[in-house]
Swiss-Prot record:
It catalyses: (2R)-2-phosphoglycerate = phosphoenolpyruvate + H2O. This is Enolase. Its EC number is 4.2.1.11. Binds a second Mg(2+) ion via substrate during catalysis. The active site is at residues 205, 338. It is found in: Cytoplasm; Secreted; Cell surface. Pathway: Carbohydrate degradation; glycolysis; pyruvate from D-glyceraldehyde 3-phosphate: step 4/5. The keyword Lyase applies. It comes from the Bacteria. Keywords: Cytoplasm, Glycolysis, Lyase, Magnesium, Metal-binding, Secreted.
């Protein structure tokens, strides 16, 4: 029996200099699993609650000492003695302990830290890599990365409305080559921006964050960088957007300050997207509508859902019950998976399974506030998700996930699969 003997949480810092939790779970064999919890900037209102202390005299109110205490004084007592390989049972025990819909008593950050640390300890005990422990013997697909190379919106202090402009090296033969292509385009983009006199400082997720003349100019400079790096847009490299539209939505109107006609209805916003899709090799749009604008989501899905990937992030918040409703109404065709939106590994896996059964694609994602924890890289391979979104090609908090995927690809050797364009199995290409 892989019995839990001790659980310990501490307060650490994330990539934005804000506190977060790190949890260690110890087993009777002496092995230990450690996990750190990420944090988002643009968050869905139905996400599980990230518990913060609110003491303005300490870390500007963002401390997590209460969540740490909840792990050390409440959760630890309840799960000590349980078998670490009983992931479902341990996660269920923590949900019962919390007893609230959005994990507001103990905090999703407290619960998730324990959930992931338990899985890591169990994998160590069994003697297999984390991706294999979670996914079994068929975990073998390396994900196509969505690389965020221009940051805007809530992720950057600039005038760009759209939060993320991403490249997807779908023409690569394997993950290692995809990463190389992305890095080369990233450096080419820096050169392009410098040549135009733009600032090349980076945002929260490592992408460049210049002030640009329009949102479309971001696409133009990326296209130029792809060609400068020696690749063919639309064949070897595709584009993806995360609009984070909930941040732009108020009183039934979307406001894009950097557009000539800044105020847009849902219909006008769909027209705006369709125009971009017709002009550029955009294969994916995330959060194209606000999380509560389900009518807008339906219009977007009906118009573009057969041509491109329509990803729900704030819309679904990795919540199986919300996803189920979206599937029933024909909303979106893909889900973004963020571990801390729902708060346990078990519920995350439930959401992924539900999405796949409905023919939705899954994109495993980081948060804008990250740590050196690489769990999501293992998760992407464990569930054969096919896609991962973990930032740009700089900042260790982003690059560590890519480096972990390189290790996994090496370990899998000739068993490893990389599907490139084929990951978009539910749209016409």
């Amino acid at each position: 029996m892989s019995q839990i003997t001790d659980v310990y949480a501490r307060e650490i810092l994330d990539s934005r200099g804000n506190p977060t939790l790190e949890v260690e779970v110890f087993l009777d064999s002496g092995v230990m699993g450690r996990a750190a919890v990420p944090s988002g900037a643009s968050t869905g209102e139905r996400e599980a609650l990230e518990l913060r202390d609110g003491d303005k005299g300490r870390y500007l109110g963002k401390g997590v000492e209460q969540a740490v205490s909840n792990v050390n004084d409440i959760i630890a007592d309840e799960i000590t003695g349980m078998d670490a390989t009983d992931q479902v049972g341990i996660d269920k025990k923590m949900l019962e302990l919390d007893g609230t819909e959005f994990k507001s008593r103990l905090g999703a950050n407290a619960i998730l830290g324990v959930s992931l640390a338990v899985a890591k300890a169990a994998a160590e005990e069994v003697g297999v890599p984390l991706y294999q422990y979670i996914g079994g013997c068929n975990a073998k697909e390396l994900p196509l990365p969505m690389m965020n190379i221009i940051n805007g919106g809530a992720h950057a202090d600039n005038n760009v409305d759209i939060q993320e402009f991403m490249i997807m090296p779908a023409g690569a033969a394997n993950f290692k080559e995809a990463l190389r292509m992305g890095a080369e385009i990233f450096h080419a983009l820096k050169s392009v921006l410098k040549g135009k006199g733009y600032n090349t400082a980076v945002g929260d997720e490592g992408g460049f964050a210049p002030n640009l003349k329009s949102n479309e100019e971001a696409l133009e400079v990326i296209m130029e960088a792809i060609v400068k790096a020696g690749y063919k847009p639309g064949e070897e490299v595709l584009l993806a957007l995360d609009v984070a539209s909930s941040e732009l939505f108020e009183n039934g109107v979307y406001t894009l300050e950097n557009e000539a006609e800044s105020k847009k209805t849902a219909d006008q916003l769909v027209d705006f997207y369709e125009n971009l899709v017709n002009k550029y090799p955009i294969v994916s749009i995330e959060d194209g509508m606000a999380e509560n604008d389900w009518d807008g989501w339906k219009k977007l899905t009906d118009r573009l859902g057969k041509r491109i990937q329509i990803v729900g992030d704030d819309l679904f918040v990795t919540n199986p019950s919300i996803l189920k409703e979206g599937i029933k109404k024909g909303i979106a065709n893909s889900i973004l998976i963020k571990l801390n939106q729902i708060g346990t590994l078990t519920e995350t896996l439930d959401a992924i399974e539900m999405a796949k059964r409905a023919g939705y694609t899954c994109v495993i994602s980081h948060r804008s506030g990250e740590t050196e924890d690489t769990t999501l890289a293992d998760l992407a391979v464990a569930v054969n998700a096919g896609q991962i979104k973990t930032g740009s090609l700089c900042r260790t908090d982003r690059v560590c996930k890519y480096n972990q995927l390189l290790r996994i690809e090496d370990e899998l050797d000739d068993v490893a699969q990389f599907r490139g364009h084929e990951v978009f199995y539910n749209i016409k290409k």
